[in-house]
Each structure stands twice: as C-alpha cells, then as structure tokens.
C-alpha cells in the first residue's frame, strides 16, 4: 500500500506504517523536524521517501492508496501529561488551528487515489479540531465517506467509538494502559 504521511515528523506513525509493510512518503515543512524523522528511520532500520514541503502544496504527489493527516492542533488531548495546557490554550488559537487544519484536509484529499482512504486525526479534545472538521469536509466532498471503526480492531473498545463511527479516545480512558491514554 502506498501511504502519504502528512505533517509526519518526528515519525512515530511513519515507522509504524513502514513496519506494517507500507511504501511511505513522509512530508513535513520543518527542516529540523524532518532531520529528526530521518534519524528515527535510520535508527529503527526503516526507509521512506522524505519530502520537505508544505503539505498543502505538493504538486508532484497524487494517487496514494492512503493519505494520513495528523494535523497540527491544540494538543488538548495530552492534558493528562501536560496539565498546563488548560491555562495556555484559548479559543482564538483553537480557531486559528481549525482554519489551518481545514486547509490541510482539503489539500490531503487531492492526494488520495479514487477509492483510496483519507485518515484525519489530531490529539485534540476540541470538537472544532476533530468531529466538526471531518463533518464539514464531508458536507463538501460527497465522494468521501466515513469508514466506521470496528470493535474487531485491536485495542478498540466500545466506548471509544462515537455515534458517527469516529474513534475518540479521552485521557480518562485506560484500554489496558495503567496510566491512561492521550485524547485523540
């Protein structure tokens, strides 16, 4: 499977995709973060095509079986580990991030081959950055649909699936982890 990993650095998901046998093209706009991704790939013995570019303007990339967009976000899902976020994030910053996420999501859709998959995720608890982002996208892109998360997927529990079929984890959930998990 060919996978385009947008906003890929530092590369955790890139390496998981490589380990699963995918042919990965990893994109990030930051030279420093891309170098960290490259180092991580080398250290783990994986290879991927690395593209230093803004994810919203990749004229040479198209026709991927799957496009993964882990969009820049408020990171409110990491409150369990970073409680200070509750005091430093404001509505204005979330609104600005939502605008950027929308641009990236629209761009990501252009890189998916017909019949391919687009995976959108953030580590935010904010509806504006998650479910509302996807719902708004689907209203204007009728050729895309939600593939509901199945309980048969490893590690997925019933309370993690929203009525719309989205996967939503919260810091209060444990799913076998003794110290909880991040919100996604």
Protein language model regions, located:
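S-adenosylmethionine
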Residues: 1-184
